[in-house]
Amino acid sequence: MNPESASCPDRHFFGPASSRMTVNGTIYPIEVGMRKVALKRTYECKGEPFNSMPLYDTSGPFGDPNGEHDVRKGLEPVRDRWGFDNGSAESTKGELSMSERKPRVAKSGEAVTQMHFARKGVITPEMEYVAIRENQALEEWIEKCGGKPVTPEMVRDEVAKGRAIIPANINHPEIEPMIIGRNFRVKINANIGNSALGSSIDEEVEKAVWACRWGADTVMDLSTGKNIHQTREWILRNSPVPIGTVPLYQALEKVGGKAEELSWEVYRDTLVEQAEQGVDYFTIHSGILAATLPDAEARQTGIVSRGGSIMARWCRAHNQENFLFTHFDDICDILRSYDVAVSLGDALRPGSIGDANDAAQFGELKTLGELTLRAWERDVQVMIEGPGHVPLHMIRENMELQLKHCHEAPFYTLGPLVTDVAAGYDHINSAIGGTLIASLGCSMLCYVTPKEHLGLPDRDDVREGVIVHRVAAHAADLAKGSHTAWLRDELMSKARYAFEWEDQFSLALDPLKTRQIHAQNIAATGDTAATAKFCTMCGPDFCSMKRSQETTAGM
């Protein structure tokens, strides 16, 4: 494993002005981690002085410039210290984790989900944590702008109504809880995972840590190669963000890769295995039905979901209904016992713009809405997965129908990609569609890397994919009226006009790349970030901001 990117924090990763800060809870003994960047100047925004900016931070302990971490030991089980006794869980006889912690499960007939407690009127430590985290220690600023800070009660209400989820398996004590819902900050997910053609456990753990450090709010382990269980264990024990999986992939490995030999029993045991390890949410393709297969098979690009194609093959081979649909209530009984959220997979998402918004896609969406209500009956947290390849002018309909058919459960989309001809640049393609759908109410964007449709991404691709989708999510937050997002842009604009390069680097979504590009270009002029009153795009004689300042000064 590369120690520079994982076990040993890079002291300059976020810049020398950056530090890790915590905000204490008032209901529970929690410490909410954030990033604080000190600014060289004091900037005035709406009459308020700012000499620093608190930022939402997904890097966890790995982002602490003073921390040392051994990925072979894992992170500290911080949630174990919060003192919340739900009275409904007990230890199992399951396999010990690499941290020597026995898995826990709900007592017979009980539920331990965030939705369960929310509906009972109970504010959990996780609810208080995400409320503090969403505000970024800027409650006074939010109120000054005419907004309302997020409160634990608001979080509880959103979770109780199913409009938001807090994916936090009781067996994943290492995570820093986060919330997914359209009334909160837009989140992004990064996919990692080995395949039969390459990648080791060390590489996947490194990519997971790398993704968190660059801004991934959740990580999905989509491993389909060897050592799936061990790879997932290492990732979970070192992840400060929720981890999702597609259990069907491991179930398929257990039957030698033959979809026809899958069974409910194999799948059920896989769910329990992964839930005991601490997986926070499962993508489950329960919405693809035998009756919808003819519509999907008539498409230009057929079924492009791996899980969807596996279950379609099983249905055809056995001439039976999808067992993930017929056993959905049984699945929910397992999920409620560990607080694993279900991400209802869009097995029939369009794989080309010619298939967008067709009968197969929207027929499945209605089924997902029906399954949402069944999951909620058991207090299981739900989010809905969405497309896919959709041209810009057809995106709005996706968001409107999702809200209508799926009862306002959070929407989680792969893009959408707005064209089919952007190979090599599909991360940008995805971010274009993602920005639009997130501004309309999508809660989380699944990142796409430059390798989409071409190959397995490496850690540089992960970084690129995360940052591009972080831009999309931030742009959507601005469009939705986020006062914390607006403040960051306001401070950046003021720093830019003042030629305070270090402040610009600190406020950028990618401080490292921003600093590197500027240093490489300004060196040829003999200036530095401390002295340059221009950039090499225009030079000292044609810098519009410099000229504007000179003109204003002469008036």
UniProtKB/Swiss-Prot annotation:
This is Phosphomethylpyrimidine synthase. It comes from Chlorobaculum parvum (strain DSM 263 / NCIMB 8327) (Chlorobium vibrioforme subsp. thiosulfatophilum). It comes from the Bacteria. Its EC number is 4.1.99.17. Zn(2+) binds at H389, H453. Belongs to the ThiC family. Catalyzes the synthesis of the hydroxymethylpyrimidine phosphate (HMP-P) moiety of thiamine from aminoimidazole ribotide (AIR) in a radical S-adenosyl-L-methionine (SAM)-dependent reaction. [4Fe-4S] cluster binds at C535, C538, C543. Binds 1 [4Fe-4S] cluster per subunit. The cluster is coordinated with 3 cysteines and an exchangeable S-adenosyl-L-methionine. One of its GO terms (molecular function) is zinc ion binding. Substrate binds at N191, M220, Y249, H285, S305, R306, G307, D346, A347, L348, R349, E385, Y412. Pathway: Cofactor biosynthesis; thiamine diphosphate biosynthesis. HAMAP family: ThiC. It is an enzyme of class 4 (lyase).
